[in-house]
Amino acid sequence: QRAVEFGAEGIGLTRTEHMFFDERARDAVVRMILADTQEARDEALAEMLPIQEQDFEGLFEAMDGKPVIMRLIDPPMHEFLPPYHELIEEVAKLRVTKPDSDELAEKEKMLEIVSGMWETNPMMGLRGCRAGIMYEGLTEMQTRAYFQAACRCAKRGVDVHPEVMIPLVGHVNELKLEREKLEAVAEEVMEEEGVEVPAIFGTMIEVPRAAL
């Protein structure tokens, strides 16, 4: 609302990952990343959805009549987990103080996962659109929350202009895969809500490969 008062003409992109750093969602995000089964991942995503939807509703209401571009989750997944160097220190201490504890076993498991996620070139690694492809249900959840918020705001008379940015696309097939499934989610939500809203999907050319 403050941005509108200062003359903002819309939201160029919403960094949706900031919502995941919120204490309301942090535990569910970690469980989603660490899930061993799709069922466990879906349970975590179900907890994250209403938090995203609530935040999106606030954005649409504040930007009444102006475009709101939602950038789907962008950073590497390990950024939502404890830092590697902190885990190393904690594991080292626990091996001395609590060598046979469940706490040590949990920390060692987390350290193994975080180590496995380390990448030499994260910009082209498992993040952005590729995380959306590999973590089944993640970007579908975000898209559902976004269009549920848009439809429900529209029912209350808010003039919504939703747009979706698929991040870090390096190859046209990445865009095709994500766009196809997310457009289907948007259409499904509009059918469920009984209201039509604009549904624009695109990307930002932000890596050299995409430009070439």
Task: Locate each region found by the language model.
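Conserved alpha/beta-domain cores
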Residues: 1-212
